Structure formats: structure tokens, C-alpha cells
Amino acid sequence: VRIILMSLLDKVNMSLSLYHYKGLGIFWVDSIMDQYIIKGGMSLAGEVTVSGAKNAALGILAAAIMTDEEVLIDNLPDVKDINVMLEAIAQTGVYVDRINRNKVKINASKLHSCVVDDEYIRRIRASYYLIGALLGKYHKAEVALPGGCEIGARPIDQHLKGFRALGANIDISSGRINASSDKLKGAHIFLDIVSVGATINIMLAASLIPGKTVI
């Protein structure tokens, strides 16, 4: 049996030889570029703990700073992007209590800055969600251009198009995005390409403003 698992996020060029799982089975894994070829045929048994979804968690963390109420998030994956996002949020004045590796308590009632330090933002691409969250709640945000991505050229023009449609003024200079508006309002937004990230970001920005937004 050959099972090919396509990885859209990681470009891997390595070969993994025989893999033993608790002595109950052996299978051969060969990884070339962006696919894994698994040749089975042996019995496998064991337990695997499935962590929370990283991409969903990043959007939820951004949404958590849009309320002054305490937010408790459980089953967070313990990965770099999540840890950096929590550091970036805490830097703005948000109270972040890391209860354990997979649970965090957030309270943004004392958020005092809409400027996010470059130190955090350039390390993860999903930091752009903070633009939508801060813009939607406080009508301003200053964030470095996001990093942490090597999957070709992935501009955030659709995000900015959505923010502008909601009434935001966008200025990009010296590697930073400045978004602000005296009055945001709902709008009909047509994305030029299908973009999950842009959709989430626009939803964040539109969630607390008057009027209906259609994407």
C-alpha cells in the first residue's frame, strides 16, 4: 500500500528509514520534497494525542484581545508560532497567564498599545491577524510586515483591500503597516483571490463596527 500525503506547508528533503512504534510495527517512510511515501503492511498500535489546530488558534488568540472579558483557551498546540503570538500580545499590555503548555488565560482590559514590536511580528506570518483585531477594536494598528513564511510570494494585499473597504487608511513605509480610521463601517468586499487569512482578518476588523459586512 502506498499512501502519499501532500504537505502544502513544508518543503522537506530527507529520507526516514525504518520507524519502530512501541515495538509493534515497522513501516518505511521515504520523504522527497513535499510528499511522504509510506509503504505499510505491518500492524501498528498505540496512542497519539492530537493537539489543537495551530491556524485556528492563532486567529482565536487575535480575537481574544478584542474583548475586555477574560478568555480561557484550552488545547493550544505548544509550537513556536503560538508562543510568539502570545509574546506579541503580552507586549501590548494584555495580561497573558500561561497556565500550562496547552492552556492560556487572556485579559485585554488593560491593553495600552496598538503598536506591536517588530521582534515578534517578523517571526510569524499570522501576526497580521493583530492588524484586524486592533483596527476593529481600537481603530488603529501599527505592525511590521509579517514574516515567518517561505512559501513563495504571499502578499497581504487582499487583507489591506478589505481594511480599506471598511474605511481604514493604510500606509506602508519602512517595513511597517499603519492602519487607522476615525470611523469604520460595514461594506461589501470582493476578494480577488480566495484567501482564508484575508477572510479571517476582515472578519476580525468588521466584528465590532456598525453595519453589515459581506465578503
Task: List the model feature ranges, each with a label.
Residues 14-215:
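Structural preference for solvent-exposed beta-strand-turn elements
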Residues 6-7, 136:
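Intrinsically disordered, low-complexity polar segments enriched in Ser/Thr/Pro and acidic
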Residues 7-9, 18:
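Glycine-centered signal
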